[in-house]
Design a protein with these regions (language model features):
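Acidic, polar-rich low-complexity tracts and alpha-helical solenoid repeat scaffolds
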Residues: 1-418
Length: 418
C-alpha cells in the first residue's frame, strides 16, 4: 500500500512539474510577444509624435500671428512637447534602473529629478505674449504653472496660477525668469521692478499698515475669463504653495485664504480636502480653537456625505478624529510653554464639554471623547483618560464602543496601580 501511495505521489509531482513548466514556457512566450508589440507601438507613437511636432512647428513658422489658428496650434504643440519630455524622462529612468540592476551603483545619481518641461513652458508663454485673449488662456496658465512647479520653480508657478484665478489683482509676465532673477540680484539702476511686476511682492507680509493685521489678498478675486476651468485645482495648489512656505510670516494665513475660496462651494470636488487643509493649517499655527472647529466640520461633512450618497465624504475623517483627540488633550493652547491649568485655564476635559468648541449633540461627539482619552492614556495620564471615558459612557450608554471602553477603563486602573 505504501509503495502504491509513493508511486502515485511521484506521478502527481511529475505531472504538476510538466504542467507548470509548460505554463511558464507559454507565459514567457506571450510576455515576449506582448513586449515586442508594446515596443513597436511605442516606436510608432514616438515617430507619429515627432511628425506632428514638425508639422505644428512648420505651421507656426509660416503663420506666426494668425489669431484664429496659431494659438490652437501652439497649444497642441505644447501638449506634444509635454508628452515627449515625459517619455524621454521615463527612458532615462528605465536605463538608469537597468544599469543599477547590472551593478552600477551610481547610475541613478545623474538622473534628473523631473522631466525637462521647458519647451512646453516656452510655447505657452509665447501664447500669453501674443494671444492674451485666447479662449483657452485658462488652460495655458494652469499648465505653465504645473510645468514650472514640476521643475521645482514654485514661485514662478504661483505667479501663473494667480493670473488665472485672481486676474483682477495679478497679471502674469511671461518673462518671469528674468524678473525673479532681478528680484534676487537687485534691480538695475532706474528700474522699478516692484511697480512693473507686482507679483514680486507676494512673498512679503500682506498687512494693514495701520493695524498690522493680515489682510486677505484673495478676498475679491475674479478669474481671467468667465467660466474658467481648473479654478478649484489652482486655488488648492496656491494654498499648498503657501502652506509649504516656512519663511513668510503670513504663509499660513495666505494658505487658509486660498483654501477658503474652495470652501465657498460645498459641492466642489476638492471641498473635503480643502477643509482638512484649513484645519491642519490652523493646527500648525497653534490656533487650536479654529483647528478643532474645522476638524469637526470635516467629520460632520464626511458623515453628511455618507448619509446622502452611501459613500464616505472624506478618507481623511479618521485622521481628523485623531487630531481632534490630540488637540483637546494638548495642555498649552496659548503656546507660552506654561501648562494652561497652571494659569487658571481649562483642562482637556473641560474643553471637550465646551459647546463652542465641540458640539455635544452629534453622532460623532462621543468618538472625540474616546479619542481624547486615548491620547491621555498614551501619555500615561490614566486618571484623565478614565474621567473622560466614564463621562462619555454615562452620557452615551448605548454607544457601540461602550463594552470596549469599559474594558479600557479597567485596563487604565490596573496600569495606574502598577
Amino acid at each position: 500500500m505504501g509503495s502504491f501511495t509513493a508511486s502515485g505521489e511521484t506521478y502527481r509531482d511529475t505531472v504538476v512539474s510538466l504542467v507548470r513548466r509548460e505554463y511558464l514556457r507559454q507565459r514567457r512566450s506571450r510576455d515576449q510577444w506582448f513586449a515586442r508589440q508594446i515596443r513597436e507601438e511605442e516606436r510608432l507613437t514616438n515617430e507619429a509624435r515627432e511628425r506632428a511636432i514638425a508639422l505644428f512647428e512648420r505651421f507656426i513658422r509660416r503663420y506666426p500671428d494668425d489669431p484664429n489658428y496659431t494659438p490652437d496650434a501652439m497649444f497642441r504643440l505644447g501638449e506634444l512637447y509635454f508628452e515627449r519630455s515625459a517619455v524621454q524622462f521615463q527612458e532615462l529612468y528605465d536605463a538608469a534602473t537597468l544599469a543599477r540592476a547590472n551593478g552600477d551603483e551610481d547610475a541613478m545619481d545623474a538622473l534628473p529629478l523631473a522631466p525637462n518641461l521647458q519647451p512646453t513652458v516656452d510655447i505657452y508663454q509665447r501664447i500669453v505674449r501674443q494671444f492674451p485673449n485666447y479662449r483657452r488662456i485658462d488652460g495655458v496658465l494652469y499648465l505653465i504653472g504645473y510645468c514650472l512647479n514640476e521643475m521645482a520653480r514654485p514661485e514662478e508657478a504661483r505667479d501663473a496660477w494667480l493670473a488665472l484665478v485672481c486676474a483682477n489683482h495679478f497679471a502674469y509676465d511671461p518673462d518671469q525668469a528674468r524678473y525673479h532673477a532681478a528680484a534676487e540680484g537687485g534691480a538695475a539702476e532706474g528700474e522699478d521692478d516692484a511697480a512693473a511686476h507686482p507679483s514680486l511682492g507676494l512673498g512679503t507680509a500682506v498687512v494693514d499698515v495701520t493695524t498690522q493685521v493680515f489682510v486677505n489678498p484673495y478676498a475679491e478675486c475674479t478669474t481671467i475669463i468667465p467660466e474658467a476651468r481648473f479654478v478649484s485645482e489652482t486655488w488648492f495648489r496656491i494654498g499648498e504653495y503657501h502652506f509649504d512656505d516656512y519663511v513668510d510670516t503670513f504663509a499660513v494665513d495666505k494658505s487658509i485664504a486660498a483654501y477658503n475660496v474652495i470652501l465657498r462651494d460645498p459641492e466642489d470636488r476638492n471641498y473635503g480636502l480643502a477643509l482638512y487643509k484649513v484645519a491642519w493649517a490652523y493646527y500648525r499655527a497653534n490656533r487650536f480653537e479654529q483647528a478643532v472647529r474645522h476638524f469637526g466640520m470635516l467629520v460632520q461633512w464626511s458623515d453628511d456625505q455618507m448619509a446622502a450618497t452611501g459613500r464616505a465624504g472624506s478618507d481623511l475623517r479618521p485622521e481628523a478624529m485623531q487630531y481632534l483627540g490630540i488637540t483637546f488633550a494638548y495642555g498649552d493652547w496659548n503656546d507660552n510653554m506654561v501648562p494652561d491649568l497652571e494659569e487658571g485655564g481649562q483642562s482637556g476635559f473641560q474643553r471637550l464639554q465646551n459647546q463652542a468648541l465641540l458640539p455635544q449633540d452629534r453622532e460623532w461627539t462621543p468618538d472625540v471623547y474616546f479619542a481624547t482619552g486615548e491620547v491621555f492614556y498614551e501619555e500615561a495620564k490614566y486618571q484623565d483618560a478614565i474621567t473622560i471615558w466614564q463621562y462619555a459612557l454615562a452620557h452615551w450608554p448605548n454607544h457601540r464602543l461602550v463594552p470596549h471602553y469599559i474594558d479600557r477603563i479597567a485596563t487604565a486602573y490596573r496600569d495606574m496601580a502598577d
